[in-house]
Design a protein with these regions (language model features):
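N-terminal targeting sequences that direct proteins away from the cytosol to non-cytosolic compartments
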Residues: 2-75, 116, 132-136, 146-147, ...
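Conserved polar/disulfide-associated segments of primarily extracytoplasmic proteins
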Residues: 58-152, 157, 161
């Protein structure tokens, strides 16, 4: 009887120790990793990205680089576009045109918008939800103009995944530098 009580007591102490040590399981909620790799673009910018995000450099089109999040949804990514602009184009004129374009998306709902900086340059940032390509997505877009080029960073994800990767996306945006 004493032996059985001792075994039960030791078992209870072990279970309590494991529970008290803070062992948890993170099922279904991935822990985003910090941006550690650097992408150096021939289009005049650098940006850091996490090693578990897939980098894609399209051979043509507006997107200079696209980083896919480690989710199964191909629409979830952060991408950088670089557009040549005339010398007389300003951030405010591009902002008016860009906002008009995104407001045309189906089910557009603005969450926040305002002036900010990107790579140390005056910029504009907007966060919104909209239906794009048949998918309801949440977006953050930030853009600036420098040396006759417009740099646009777009982070987009399913609204249920958006906040999970938002801090990583913001770290990537904060790492963006124009050469």
């Amino acid at each position: 009887l004493i032996k059985r009580t001792a075994i039960l007591l030791i078992g209870a102490v072990l279970i309590i120790s494991v529970l008290a040590s803070g062992c948890t399981f993170n099922v279904g909620n991935p822990t985003p990793s910090a941006p550690t790799n650097t992408y150096d673009s021939a289009k005049g910018f650098t940006i850091k990205y996490p090693s578990d995000w897939t980098k894609d450099v399209p051979k043509s089109g507006a997107i200079s680089v696209l980083f896919r999040m480690p989710t199964k949804n191909a629409e979830e990514n952060l991408n950088v576009q670089v557009w040549n602009r005339s010398a007389n184009e300003t951030l405010s004129s591009r902002t008016a045109l860009t906002l008009a374009a995104v407001q045309d998306f189906s089910n557009y709902t603005e969450i926040s918008a305002g002036n900010t900086t990107l790579g140390g340059n005056p910029a504009y940032k907007v966060t919104y939800t909209a239906t794009y390509g048949g998918d309801h997505l949440k977006f953050t877009q930030i853009w600036t103009i420098k040396h006759g080029k417009e740099y646009i960073i777009t982070y987009k994800a399913d609204p249920k995944n958006f906040d999970t990767y938002a801090s990583t996306a913001q770290q990537m945006i904060d790492s963006f530098k124009i050469k």
